[in-house]
């Protein structure tokens, strides 16, 4: 489905709490959300993609859409103001995405995503 990743972006955090959370909740919200979406009738594959938004699912073989979702979710979150911090600038967010959030992680689309973001920055300037 051509809207699979977009739909996952909208629904993958359905069980994520608001405000500061403890580490255990951070580790389980994606799985809880995927289980909830499954009960609503979403396909197993779609639910797996949503569960893999972060790396806590433990799935060794990730869906390719999960890698896209991970990039969008992490990067987008860094561009938002939070009660505990102001939003990062685009270039700062890209550095943090690569060297903190995805450090030692294999995301097959990271380089293409960075290239896309940089090209869009040039369009905006």
Spans of features found by a protein language model:
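Short active-site segment of divalent metal-dependent hydrolases/proteases
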Residues: 15-16, 76
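Post-HEXXH active-site segment of zinc metalloproteases
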Residues: 22-28
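Generic helix N-cap/helix-start motif at coil->alpha-helix transitions
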Residues: 30-34
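Short acidic/His/Gly/Ser-rich catalytic and metal-binding motifs that mark active-site loops
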Residues: 16-18, 59
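Histidine/acidic-rich helix-loop-helix segments that form or flank divalent-metal centers
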Residues: 5, 9, 24, 35-72, ...
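Short pre-active-site segment immediately N-terminal to the catalytic Zn-binding motif
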Residues: 1-2
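Generic hydrophobic alpha-helical membrane-span motif
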Residues: 18-19, 79
């Amino acid at each position: 489905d051509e809207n699979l990743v977009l739909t996952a972006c909208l629904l993958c955090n359905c069980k994520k709490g608001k405000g500061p959370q403890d580490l255990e909740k951070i580790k389980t919200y994606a799985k809880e959300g995927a289980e909830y979406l499954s009960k609503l009738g979403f396909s197993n594959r779609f639910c797996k993609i949503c569960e893999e938004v972060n790396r806590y699912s433990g799935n060794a073989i990730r869906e390719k859409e999960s890698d896209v979702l991970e990039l969008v979710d992490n990067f987008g979150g860094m561009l938002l103001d939070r009660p505990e911090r102001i939003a990062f600038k685009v270039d700062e967010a890209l550095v943090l995405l690569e060297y903190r959030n995805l450090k030692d992680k294999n995301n097959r689309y990271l380089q293409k995503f960075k290239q896309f973001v940089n090209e869009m920055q040039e369009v905006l300037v």
